[in-house]
Amino acid sequence: MNQPNSLYLALLIEAKWQNPEDFHFSSDFAKHWLLEQGSLSRRLARHCQHLTVELMRNEKSGMGQLTRQETQGLSPEICLIREVVLSGDQTPWVLGRTLIPETTLADQPYDLATLGDIPLGLTVFSAEQVERDALQVAWIETPQGRLLARRSRLWMNHKPMLVAELFLPDAPIYSRESV
């Protein structure tokens, strides 16, 4: 993992999450991106010719390696940790970190542990039963300035996973704003 991605990931993990009703959105444009209920991957794909995934980490880990914030809303068990960078036309747009409990991996129509360079959102939102709840948002201070982030719990066929996403400096969410 390169140094900027390591820094971004550390900042994402330690984000000070807020409920949307308590958050100061910089614009309605950013608010719509952050509160997106559907697949972020699909939304990003509409803004480029080629959406690609760089898989940085895809391994199981015990709950002891997760922060207290991360374990809220998930059962205390081993999780698959999937960390990726989503890029549009070779420009990094979103750093994502997903925690998928072992019980969520079991009995699914898709093998979430072997997605590789397939966007998670395209797979999850292809399932019959998908819901998003516990959506929170944050500003994250970086050496390049303030960046927006969100996290939520996705339910795929009634089984949870926690998804956190940091919108990198060149992401389309900033195309109509100055942060």
Swiss-Prot record:
Q: Tell me the route in metabolism or biology where this protein functions.
A: Cofactor biosynthesis; ubiquinone biosynthesis
> What EC number is given for this enzyme?
4.1.3.40
Localization recorded for this chain is:
Cytoplasm
| Binding locations of substrate | R82, L120, E165
Q: Which GO terms describe its molecular function?
A: chorismate lyase activity
The UniProt record lists the keyword Endoplasmic reticulum:
no
Catalytic activity reported: chorismate = 4-hydroxybenzoate + pyruvate
Q: Its family? A: Belongs to the UbiC family.
Q: What does this protein do?
A: Removes the pyruvyl group from chorismate, with concomitant aromatization of the ring, to provide 4-hydroxybenzoate (4HB) for the ubiquinone pathway.
Q: What is this protein called?
A: Probable chorismate pyruvate-lyase
